[in-house]
């Protein structure tokens, strides 16, 4: 089945090398070394896009047709969902909420060509929030001096993730599938900052959101609480020994952005009101989740 789908997407992007990196119910995600407009592998002079973090690897997301749907209905659904996802990402970019930059689109064929965020961790995995925590857990087992419960970098990254989600929700935007796999960590080298002393330079991570196939716009505290609960549960299931600490740091960051001085006094008050409503609703969502677990 996968070979058939790969052959199908190759019809829409001919002569483009593709490596499948994930397959979901709605879409396939490929990695490619080819930019749709620039030949970065050529020795010829070219203009690099200043907005892209990566000029060697790109992502192609493809929504395949569904054979059980009428062709016209299928086209409308895929086109509508692709347009919706792209609009959501453009809105994020305008708000400076970190996400991949869009390079090219083909709405009729359900294709989004975008930049590839993140990098490879020392163990060879992509630097998603989940994989990074897994890597640190493996390092902790080998080195007793490492303690994830009391690690300044882990605390900072978790708070940054919480701040990122807070900014998303303050703009009444819902991710819809907020797992730790859909948060990518991008390395930032402080040496690139001219104000940084070269002897004191270091590398830290900035989080970005990916995969907006289930995204939506909503000001409801319920929808924001469900977003947070999905991430809480994802962390609990994959990092159970550290979940309480990690989720606590995440909520600290989430609260920090609602209290942020980057907003004027009126917006601060509104942010605090929204925060109160969301946290209260989150407690209700947690309670429902526990009841479902008890009932099986």
Swiss-Prot record:
The active site is at residue 177. The gene is BUD32. Keywords: Activator, ATP-binding, Chromosome, Cytoplasm, Hydrolase, Kinase, Nucleotide-binding, Nucleus, Phosphoprotein, Serine/threonine-protein kinase, Telomere, Transcription, Transcription regulation, Transferase, tRNA processing. The keyword 4Fe-4S does not apply. Residues 15-296 form the Protein kinase domain. Component of the EKC/KEOPS complex composed of at least BUD32, CGI121, GON7, KAE1 and PCC1; the whole complex dimerizes. GO terms for cellular component: chromosome, telomeric region; cytosol; EKC/KEOPS complex; nucleus. It is found in: Cytoplasm; Nucleus; Chromosome, Telomere. It catalyses: L-seryl-[protein] + ATP = O-phospho-L-seryl-[protein] + ADP + H(+); L-threonyl-[protein] + ATP = O-phospho-L-threonyl-[protein] + ADP + H(+). ATP binds at residues 21-29, 61. Gene3D superfamilies: Phosphorylase Kinase, domain 1 (3.30.200.20), Transferase(Phosphotransferase) domain 1 (1.10.510.10). This is EKC/KEOPS complex subunit BUD32. Its main location: cytoplasm. It comes from Candida albicans (strain SC5314 / ATCC MYA-2876) (Yeast).
């Amino acid at each position: 089945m996968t070979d058939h789908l790969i052959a199908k997407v190759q019809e829409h992007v001919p002569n483009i090398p593709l490596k499948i990196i994930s397959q979901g119910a709605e879409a396939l995600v490929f990695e490619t070394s080819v930019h749709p407009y620039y030949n970065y592998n050529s020795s010829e002079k070219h203009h690099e896009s200043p907005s892209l973090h990566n000029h060697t690897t790109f992502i192609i997301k493809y929504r395949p047709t569904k054979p059980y749907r009428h062709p016209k209905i299928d086209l409308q659904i895929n086109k509508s969902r692709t347009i919706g996802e792209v609009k959501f990402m453009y809105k994020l970019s305008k708000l400076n909420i970190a996400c991949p930059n869009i390079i090219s689109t083909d709405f009729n064929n359900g294709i989004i060509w975008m930049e590839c965020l993140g990098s490879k961790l020392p163990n060879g995995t992509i630097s998603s929030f989940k994989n990074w925590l897994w890597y640190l857990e493996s390092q902790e087992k080998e080195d007793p001096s490492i303690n994830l419960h009391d690690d300044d970098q882990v605390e900072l990254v978790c708070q940054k993730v919480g701040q990122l989600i807070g900014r998303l929700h303050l703009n009444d935007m819902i991710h819809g599938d907020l797992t730790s796999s859909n948060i990518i960590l991008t390395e930032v080298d402080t040496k690139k900052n001219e104000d940084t002393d070269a002897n004191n330079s270091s590398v830290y991570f900035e989080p970005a959101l990916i995969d907006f196939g289930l995204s939506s716009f909503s000001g409801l505290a319920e929808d924001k609480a469900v977003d947070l609960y999905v991430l809480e549960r994802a962390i609990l299931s994959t990092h159970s020994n550290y979940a309480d600490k990690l989720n606590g740091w995440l909520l600290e960051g989430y609260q920090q952005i609602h209290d942020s001085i980057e907003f004027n006094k009126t917006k601060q008050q509104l942010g605090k009101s929204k925060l109160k409503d969301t946290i209260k609703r989150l407690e209700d969502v947690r309670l429902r989740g526990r009841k479902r677990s008890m009932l099986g």
